UniProtKB/Swiss-Prot annotation:
This is Tigerinin-4. It is found in: Secreted. Disulfide bonds join C3-C11. Its main location: secreted. It comes from Hoplobatrachus tigerinus.
Amino acid sequence: RVCYAIPLPIC
């Protein structure tokens, strides 16, 4: 999966 950090890191 792809991890996003907007605003917290969520994978």
